[in-house]
Design a protein with these regions (language model features):
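Active-site-adjacent substrate-binding region
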Residues: 59-84
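Catalytic-core regions of hydrolytic enzymes
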Residues: 1-61
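Active-site-adjacent mobile loop/cap segments within catalytic or ligand-binding domains
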Residues: 22, 27, 34, 41-42, ...
């Protein structure tokens, strides 16, 4: 729960994203998963969703594996599908396989409450981990 920005930074979000990319470039991992929480103007919207860079074949495969695990292990009533994207900073700037996992919507009161519990956080982590294993085992 710690941002990768200086407390005095004028734009904390931008600095956080830049530092995430710098870490990825420095360590050159096989894959990267960036964990986030979503928001939307409609408080009824809920559920985890995984994003990948639209032209990344491997990113899409990883996103689908993680999304499937999230939908199954969290018993999502209306499962979301992965979404390709070309405008998110992390997806545009990463040279490797990277997905963004939006664990849920903080603007949905029920989901926001669940996201704050250790039990649910561990379920989300287990689902993401299972999705990564599924992706790697298919390689």
């Amino acid at each position: 729960d710690k941002g990768l920005y200086d407390s005095s930074a004028a734009n904390k979000k931008a600095q956080d994203m830049q530092r995430r990319i710098a870490m990825i470039r420095e360590h050159m991992p096989v894959l990267s998963v960036s964990i986030h929480q979503n928001s939307y103007h409609d408080a009824g919207v809920h559920g985890p969703q995984v994003f990948y860079y639209e032209s990344s074949v491997e990113g899409k495969k990883l996103a689908e594996a993680v999304q499937s695990s999230l939908n199954d292990l969290l018993e999502v009533d209306r499962p979301r599908k992965v979404k390709g994207n070309t405008s998110y900073y992390l997806l545009k700037r990463s040279s490797g396989t990277l997905v963004i996992v939006e664990c849920g919507f903080l603007t949905n009161p029920e989901e926001a409450q669940k996201l704050q519990t250790k039990e649910y956080q561990e379920k989300v982590a287990a689902a993401v981990s299972e999705g990564i294993r599924t992706y790697l085992n298919a390689q």
